Structure formats: C-alpha cells, structure tokens
Amino acid sequence: MSKQPNSADPAEIPQDQTVLRSNTDNAPRSAIHQTLYSADTFAQHDYLAGKKLPDIARPQAGQTNWLHFVGINDAALLKHALEPYGIHELVIEDILSRKQRPKIEDYDNYLFIAAQVYHYTAAGKLNSDQVYLIIGKDFVLSFQQKPLGLFSQLRRQMSENPRGILGKNTAFLAYCLLDRIVDDYFIVLEEYNNRVEAIDKSLFKNENSDILGKIHRLKRDAVRLRRTLLPLRDVFYQLAVRVDFTIFKGESTVYLRDVYDHNMQLLESLDASRDMVLSMMDIYLSFQSNRMNQQMRVLTVITIIFMPLTVITGIYGMNFDNMPELHWHYGYFIVLGLMLCIIVGLLIFFSRRKWL
C-alpha cells in the first residue's frame, strides 16, 4: 500500500477564486476534504478556508475519489470544482439552495441525492442542515452547509484503517455515507426521547411552569423529523429496488436494504414517541382542567358558606326602628353564634359529601 502525494495536473482557477471563502461574514467555515483510494493506494488531502487553494488532486486510473465540501457558498468556485465531473447546473443550483426536500435524481452518469440532518443545540433547539451526495462511477461528491462533522468519523476510520475501504467501489462508499446520515438520526432521536421522558417525569409536578410550551416544541420537532424521514424512506427504497441504477447493483443492494430498514425503524420509533407526546399533552390539559375544577369547587364552597351569612347581615343591616333583636342584650353574640353554627354545619355537610 502506498500513499499518494498531494500533486495533480494543474487546474486553471481564476485569480479571484483561489481562496476558499464564504459569501457572508457569518457563514460557516468552508473547506474541501478529499479521499483517494484504490485496491492498494490511499490518500487524504484537506483544503481549508483562508489558505491558497492548490490544485485538487486528480484521481489516477482505478482510484475512487471522494470530495467532501463544507460551507461552500461561492457559486463560481463550486462550478469550477465540479467542472471535471460534468455536473448539471440545476444540481449546482440545488446544492447552493438552503432548503431542499429529500429526493433522488438520476442523471446520465451519476445520481444526485438531497437529504437533511438535524442536531439539538445546547439551548434545546432542533436545527437542520442540508446534505447532498453526487454518486458517479468512480467518484462521490458530498456537500454540507455547516461544519458539523457528519462524516468526520468516517474519514478518521478510513485514515486509521484504510484496508477496510481499499478496493471498494463507489456504491460501498455511498452506502457508508448514507448509513452515517441514518445513524445521525438515531442520535437525534435518542436525544428527543430523553427530552420526552424528562417531561413525562415532571408532568404532574409544579416545578416547571412552561411544560405545555415544551410539549408543544416536542410535537413540532416530531413533525419536522417525520417530514424529512418520510421522503428519505422513498429515496432509500428506490436505491434498494430500482434496477436501472447501474451504480448500485448486486451486493450493494443488500447494504441499501439495511439502510432502508434502519430508516423504517426510525419512523416507527418516532411515531411511538410522537403518540406519547400527544398523550402527554392530553394528560396535561386534563390535569390542568381537573385542578381548575378543584379550585372552582373550593371557591363555590366558600361562596355557599357566605351566602346565609350575607342574608343575616343584610337583614340586620336594614334601617327599621321596630326590630326587637337590635335591643336584646345578647343579640349580637346570638347572631355571631348562629353564623358560626351555620359555618360549622355547612363544613360538616360538605365534608361528608366529600366536596372538600
């Protein structure tokens, strides 16, 4: 096994495009990561932002070329980098787009796959990122807007143990990338389920006043994830069963069926979690309604207790001269005693009725 030097045929990159950069100051750090391998050779090269862009190494005969683009928003630079592969301008337009529904498109000599990945921020917000794959006979091009390190582990595994990839075709490499995308969803779904369980435990406690808002956010996150996983399922299904995709045939379809099965597991698990979230919302609303009823019951009891007291005080508050009770020596204490007896009697009555 030999290492390939970082040399290649010169590429005429225009002078104003020789630096990897982003169009905006707050755009992600841009980079191009290259992996070249064949049956007995392996090499990796990195072209990072802010440095002079050297000629991207051209694959030799029999080599598979994987180029991973991160945060490349410069249309001119992207067109120049993809020119040797004959990529259609509509594909480049899709790659530069911020939002694309997961899909697969078959061109003459390559497949174009659009996908989305998600991650939870430290603040608990579910963010998304676009991922694109272009799969040809001897090349795979992958694109990601944000430097989230989606394929970093795969590149590191290749570097530490290149024998695992040597001699493999682009179909196997594409399977590894697609499998990594699906595995990333398992990580997100695990975090999602942890949040569901945390809210479920605090559902009947008063320690969290924003619990309804959190349940609503979980419901919204489930809708977003499902909206992506459903079309992804169709993409994996087409890759696994369509015979006109000449890149994927034979043993590679077995691997793709495995990815399809994993995607189905994700959907089933997500549906179960979503049902649990909907149940939690119903339980929480029922709990709040029951607590409101309890409060209204207490207020009603208090109102009923004071109604006869109000009648008594109203009667003796009338301005009549001939009211004999007003002149009784113990009239005041008798009325207070009567009120107290009414209160005690009503409390005993409500207690026996279990209204308190």
Task: Enumerate the predicted regions with their spans.
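Peripheral, non-transmembrane regulatory/ligand-interaction domains of membrane transport proteins
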Residues: M1-K249, D258, H262-S269, W355-L356
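Hydrophobic alpha-helical transmembrane segments and their immediately adjacent juxtamembrane loops
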Residues: D261-L356
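Membrane interface segments of multi-pass transport proteins and intramembrane proteases
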Residues: D244-T253, E325, Y330
